[in-house]
Amino acid sequence: MSGRSLGWVAGTAAAVLVAAGAITYAVAQDGGGPPARTPDAKSADAGFARDMAVHHQQAVEMSYIVRDRTKDEEVRRLAYDIAQTQANQRGMLLGWLDLWGLPKVSADPPMTWMGMRGMPPGEDGALMPGMATNTELKKLQSLDGKQAEVFYLQLMTEHHKGGIHMAEGCADKCAVGAEKRLAQGMVDAQQSEIELMAGMLKERGAHPRS
């Protein structure tokens, strides 16, 4: 992967971090107008914040695992950028729940806010679309070098696809403007990273699993 591509990823992550504080403040006023109506616990806004915080936490975990399993600087830098960006966004989502006075957990199944109440229970710890199973996480921890790189890129590609599905749901259903904008930003950034990871897999003689 070229230095230009790596620079783009790093720049994107930095831009998200710089914008984080402004978005967190803006959600209280929702763009500078009158204060937005506080979402309730069963709203799409609250459901997305709760579920995406969990989804992001796994991406952070996978990224730090692969950084310990390979010395490849391209993969290590991408993993670091993903971990930092998603950890920051996770903090914002949990912060909004605090701001709204809402619980960070719900008795409802994951994805209920998207109208997916009938979704079957997650298999082997994979609670939401794109999430890796516990077995897959253990496998990632057991691999080294190129094998770890390929498996991480495959897992993260699927993770991003699931995340995009969820973020598109918020962009459509959420009411808080700042949260809708953050969700759309996730869609755009993660789609670009999927394309980037496809190229990295090709360089390693591999391809996405789906």
Where are these regions (language model features)?
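All-alpha RGS (Regulator of G-protein Signaling) helical domain and cognate RGS-like helical scaffolds
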Residues: 2-210
